[in-house]
């Protein structure tokens, strides 16, 4: 018997944050342990806007939205931990950017036939 597939965490995070605009999401680490029915994915969220203040506000809004994920049963997210940030980290060309890193734990669910 195989464990059910785990949800795509990057996709879950992106779907929640995409309407904020100026958001990029990528996983930089992941891990699962026996019996492989849950996984924790480390996600980095880069937040861009036209000014430092707008970027700051958007980053903290993104943080709040991610912390609400475990309370949405449809999300399959069991836990969100802030790993670092939001922190000011402008692009090399000086463009405004805040970076937020979170650990998102998900659980696989078998579909009932």
Please give the residue ranges for each predicted region.
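Charged, amphipathic alpha-helical segments and their flanking helix caps
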Residues: 1-23, 27-113
């Amino acid at each position: 018997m195989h464990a059910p597939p785990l949800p795509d965490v990057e996709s879950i995070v992106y779907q929640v944050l995409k309407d904020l605009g100026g958001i990029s999401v990528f996983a930089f680490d992941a891990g699962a342990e026996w019996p492989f029915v849950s996984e924790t994915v480390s996600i980095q969220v880069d937040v861009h806007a036209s000014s430092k203040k707008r970027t700051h506000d958007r980053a903290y809004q993104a943080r709040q939205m991610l912390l609400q994920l475990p309370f949405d049963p449809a999300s399959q997210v069991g836990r969100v931990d802030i790993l670092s940030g939001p922190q000011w980290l402008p692009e090399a060309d000086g463009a405004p950017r805040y970076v937020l890193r979170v650990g998102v734990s998900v659980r696989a669910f078998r579909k009932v036939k």
